[in-house]
């Protein structure tokens, strides 16, 4: 503080102190009185600022609260029973009598629990998303993108699968443990000196994919114990009563109170680690505290309604967009309150919209999370285009490629891999729920086998060849996409192309009722092509880098999965289980007819690739070099992408959606033989066929007679590899 002194050596009042004195102060009043008046005015200034901030917050929250109340009343009017607004009001006030008294039971036992569940889930996810975005200083962070929802859902499914019956409150504890472990793993893997928003979200999204694969395994292995969890897993507000919601409301209220109480610490964390430490805040300890609170909120939401997608991303992000109009939202207490209100508004609004579009009867069976996932996927893709990624643009070219042996003897290495594939095919034919001998196969080929052996091999051999052809197709598609986009993270599954193909196939079956294999194939190709055009069109116009393109693909996968769920919940349980098995990536039920499209696709695209392999070598470098050497980059890229889409559609219709295979196989081939596509593509195809054939054999054998879809095994293998690849690619 600067001290002003007079020439007589006395301490003078700070400049302007007299002006700060209240009106009416006598001119001859002592200097101490003037100083006291100035201090009082200075102390009153922060109170005035806080009052104005509270007023602005009230002006914002009041309209949102009013709209939420009106939306809640509209929500109560929707349902399978036709009730007038007057009857709803009388039921709420307890004035219904006589023959109309049953309307009161409808409101109290069915509609109010659904409404309260939506309000609680939306508020909980809004709170959780706001906290996660604040402590990570990452606008893309949410319970979905950090794997918290997936961890909580997996934990609850595991408990149900093994027959453990828990009270509602204890289930929330299980969800909390699963969500906390997932969030801790994501944050531990993605933080550090080279962290970035995209890195963290990619790590969380891929871990969520891995956990989803494990959850799908449990749903398939224990269909009776986990009955009803499929629709619930997409985020369903259907409730058996209001007691479960009431049980968890104190937990949610306690978490919200803790956030309001410690809001100043959360404000300090926004200043950065160094600034917060200088203010006396123990950064790591308080980040851990707030992480626990966020996971508690998510656990409450997942226990009530399952993982409702992307509400925790959209609500805080929408709140931050209002900061320009309401500066008080920079305070975490204000942001948390508004995020909770907007979260509840989004969930109730999605439920109202869904039942308005689909009708009350169908709206009850469709999970609300389907609508929020579609909206949130668009939101995530939009945010991904503006976020900092932290990845180099030329990381595919600069990554290590080729071994000494592979570079010197590429043809010999390809021959060895082909021989290994033949051996694996022979072994795969022999293993499964019934072990066979080589003589059994010989007898079958010469029409001398028993009826039992004929039945086994007539179903097993097409499966083996479907795995070989599917792995070869997806691996080639992955190598093409990585070369065309110069993106080491590119994969048909990760980019959403496989999910879109599956959505197209399911739409053809459910909507049109067709059973024609070729019609379903055309629908799958249409879905894959639509996503490919959108993804690569946006990339060409906006210059998406590696990580942003992958994140956009993940958001497309989420939207496609939501649409697929929307269609599947209307099918019977038998077809639902069959569809889940196929969507998980299984060769179950494959026939020779289903292998034919893959054979055609491989032959045609193989001929094209052999002609343009040199051009692909140049395209993977940059855009300038191939143009200088006379290569038409746009035309070459279009032809190659078309080849990849055809391969993905043919493989998806035969073996379902299989993620990470198109990522792992090209990288393994590149490490062995180098970047020259004349040798890289054949080896990639062989390695892809090898991997999927082994995965299929493992899935048919380890828990026989039950089976694990091959796609789930490749997901469990590919998820750690993707995380390792992210770690290698961080900016140095």
Region spans (language model):
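Alpha-helical transmembrane segments in inner-membrane proteins
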Residues: 2-16, 20-25, 40-732
């Amino acid at each position: 503080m600067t001290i002003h002194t007079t020439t007589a050596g006395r301490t003078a009042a700070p400049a302007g102190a007299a002006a700060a004195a209240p009106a009416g102060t006598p001119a001859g009043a002592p200097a101490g009185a003037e100083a006291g008046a100035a201090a009082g005015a200075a102390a009153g200034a922060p109170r005035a600022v806080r009052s104005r901030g509270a007023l602005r917050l009230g002006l914002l929250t009041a309209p949102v609260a009013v709209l939420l109340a009106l939306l809640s009343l509209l929500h109560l009017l929707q349902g399978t029973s036709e009730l007038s607004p007057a009857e709803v009001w009388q039921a709420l006030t307890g004035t219904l009598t006589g023959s109309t008294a049953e309307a009161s039971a409808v409101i109290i036992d069915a509609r109010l629990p659904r409404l309260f569940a939506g309000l609680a889930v939306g508020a909980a996810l809004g709170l959780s998303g706001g906290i996660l975005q604040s402590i990570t200083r990452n606008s893309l962070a949410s319970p979905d993108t950090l794997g918290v929802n997936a961890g909580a859902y997996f934990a609850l499914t595991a408990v149900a699968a093994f027959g453990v019956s828990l009270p509602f409150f204890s289930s929330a504890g299980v969800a909390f443990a699963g969500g906390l472990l997932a969030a801790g793993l994501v944050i531990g893997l993605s933080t550090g000196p080279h962290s970035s928003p995209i890195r963290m979200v990619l790590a969380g999204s891929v871990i969520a994919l891995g956990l989803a694969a494990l959850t799908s395994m449990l749903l398939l292995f224990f269909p009776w114990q986990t009955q009803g969890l499929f629709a619930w897993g997409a985020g369903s507000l259907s409730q058996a009563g209001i007691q479960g919601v009431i049980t968890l409301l104190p937990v949610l209220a306690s978490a919200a109170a803790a956030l309001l109480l410690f809001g100043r610490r959360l404000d300090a964390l926004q200043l950065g680690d160094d600034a917060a430490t200088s203010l006396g805040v123990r950064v790591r300890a308080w980040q851990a505290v707030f992480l626990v609170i966020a996971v508690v909120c998510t656990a409450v939401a997942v226990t009530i309604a399952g993982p409702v997608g992307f509400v925790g991303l959209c609500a805080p992000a929408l709140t931050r967009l209002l900061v320009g109009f309401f500066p008080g939202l920079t305070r975490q207490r204000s942001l948390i309150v508004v995020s909770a209100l907007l979260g509840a508004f989004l969930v109730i609004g999605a439920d109202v919209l869904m039942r308005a579009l689909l009708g009350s009867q169908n709206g009850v069976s469709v999970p609300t999370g389907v609508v929020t996932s579609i909206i949130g996927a668009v939101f995530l893709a939009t945010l991904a285009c503006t976020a900092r990624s932290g990845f180099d643009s030329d990381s595919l070219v600069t990554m290590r490629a080729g071994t000494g042996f592979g570079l010197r003897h590429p043809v010999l290495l390809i021959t060895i891999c082909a021989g290994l594939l033949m051996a694996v095919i022979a072994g795969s034919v022999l293993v499964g729920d019934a072990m066979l001998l080589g003589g059994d196969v010989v007898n079958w080929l010469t029409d001398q086998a028993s009826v039992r052996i004929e039945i086994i091999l007539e179903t097993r051999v097409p499966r083996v060849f479907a795995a070989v052809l599917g792995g070869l197709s997806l691996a080639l598609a992955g190598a093409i996409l990585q070369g065309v986009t110069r993106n080491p993270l590119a994969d048909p599954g990760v980019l959403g192309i496989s999910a879109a193909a599956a959505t197209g196939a399911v739409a053809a079956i459910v909507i049109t009722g067709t059973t024609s294999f070729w019609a379903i194939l055309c629908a799958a190709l249409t879905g894959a092509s639509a996503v490919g055009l959108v993804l690569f069109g946006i990339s060409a116009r906006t210059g998406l880098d590696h990580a942003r393109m992958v994140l956009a693909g993940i958001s497309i996968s989420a939207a496609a999965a939501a649409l697929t769920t929307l269609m599947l919940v209307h099918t019977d349980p038998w077809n639902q289980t069959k569809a889940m098995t196929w969507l998980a990536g299984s060769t179950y039920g494959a026939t020779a007819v289903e292998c034919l499209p893959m054979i055609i696709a491989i032959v045609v695209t193989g001929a094209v690739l052999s002609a343009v392999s040199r051009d692909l070598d140049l395209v993977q470098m940059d855009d300038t070099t191939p143009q200088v050497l006379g290569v038409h980059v746009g035309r070459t890229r279009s032809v190659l992408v078309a080849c990849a889409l055809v391969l993905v559609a043919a493989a998806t219709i035969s073996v379902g959606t299989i993620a990470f295979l198109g990522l792992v196989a090209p990288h393994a081939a590149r490490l062995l033989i180098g970047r020259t596509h004349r040798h890289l593509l054949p080896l990639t195809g062989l390695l892809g066929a090898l991997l999927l054939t082994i995965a299929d054999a493992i899935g048919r054998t380890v828990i026989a007679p039950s089976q694990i879809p091959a796609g789930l095994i490749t997901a469990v293998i590919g998820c750690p590899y993707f995380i390792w690849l992210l770690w290698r690619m961080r900016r140095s």
